[in-house]
């Protein structure tokens, strides 16, 4: 654990989900839920000091993109320094609810995956559901919303996703629920972008164009 992570946890314990970063085993398990065989657009909510971000960046292709949404200014600055030479990684110091706007601003139709470790259980119900809706809207048909949480209470709120798979992962302190919420292939449009083909699961970025 870095000194920065410990310091930020002490200053903002309710914003940072755990006193220690994710274990290597958890990071690898979460990354295994994604298919990196082709270019992807991936977003991460609350990357903190970037343990998951670094694993994703190592695995994704040269034509992929990773959007990191970090509210904490110190973490955001640290992430900018870490990925300063990686044009695929975009650090956004702001709320994850900005995902649809940030995608469109950068010319991306949607995400293949959204990863989140933010503690959803502490969010007010209206904010929780609003973020779930924006996440669902921003995902490509066939895409996945992947969360790792101490509790699995989000499943009862994420009813707009058609299917979910969960596992309880013990090789982390504390143990975590890893849940993948799936968006079906049947969705036809999102946020003004038109879906053109359905050849892959999840759909790669090349399958979309601006409407």
Where are these regions (language model features)?
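SAM/dcSAM-binding transferase cores
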Residues: 5-10, 105, 133, 158-165, ...
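Conserved beta-strand signature within the Rossmann-like core of class I S-adenosyl-L-methionine
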Residues: 141-149
